[in-house]
Amino acid sequence: MEQPGPRAPDPSLCHHNLQPTDDPNWDSYATTMRTAFTPKTGAVPALIRQNGIRRLGYTYSLSDPILNQTQYSDEYTWKSHSKEDLIKTETSRGIKSHKSHLNEDIFLWTLPHCQQTGTLKNCLPWKIPASMKEVNKALSNQFISLTKRDFVDRSKAQKIKKSSHLSLEWKKLLPQPPDTEFRRNYQIPAKIPELQDFSFKYGCYSSLPVASQGLVPSVLHSYLRNQEHTKKQTTYQSDYDKTYPDFLMLLNSFTSSQVKEYLQSLSYKDRQIIDRFIRTHCDTNKKKK
């Protein structure tokens, strides 16, 4: 008969590593951070360096001598080629490398255009005895630049230009592409000679790049207008203070008794001035009627 296994612990007690309340060491302030994220201790690997390591494709061991050599220096540094593997011939048995003499067909030699190649076809170039003239020419050709060889001298170019029967209007004979909308709208505007002669340079024509001709007024209307605007202190005065006040309309708004009372309150000189003004204006209005 099978014996019952160990009893599983109560899940209420296992959750968050909580202990029963009967234990006096039970921490009532235990949080999830302290119970779930407990410090874990693991095995620390031994700090032992490997005997062999691959660095940039170059293998070496600790016992080998230290060399400043990597895969880059192996591939991209100059090496003296071995004379054994200069020529590799392929046979029916496979690829075989062996020593062989240099064949004269390997090298391609170019001769000058003026030199005949028929007589020297069967003779190697280094076996031809060079004359003193050829030696001097070879030495002088070392100092001829590409510009002097490829480009014609300016004096020769002028002779060629004069000898050619090309018309002076050769630019008009060139094929012109059709005008596009951009070329038609954004081309340089044509200068009309009638509009270029201005005898004044102010107003709407002041921005034109043309010097003024003839008499120019010393005081412009724009200067007077700007001066009038600077005298005004407020916008109301600049907008509504353009006309003088109508004194006759003011006098007609008052009665004769009000005018007499106002005149009596003034001094003798002011009263004479206002009386003269009223009589002159009243007489002119009566004559007009």
Curated annotation (Swiss-Prot):
InterPro entries, alphabetized: MEDAG/TEX26 (IPR043460)
Region (Mn 4): 179-193
Disulfide bridges in this chain: none
Segments of this protein annotated with the region Disordered: 1-26
Location of the region described as Mn 2 in the Swiss-Prot/TrEMBL record: 69-83
CC terms in the record's Gene Ontology section: cytoplasm
Region (Mn 1): 30-42
Superkingdom of origin organism: Eukaryota
Region described as Mn 3: spans on this chain: 144-157
Region (Mn 5), start-end ranges: 233-247
UniProt-recorded name of the protein: Testis-expressed protein 26
Organism whose genome encodes this protein: Homo sapiens
Name of encoding gene: TEX26
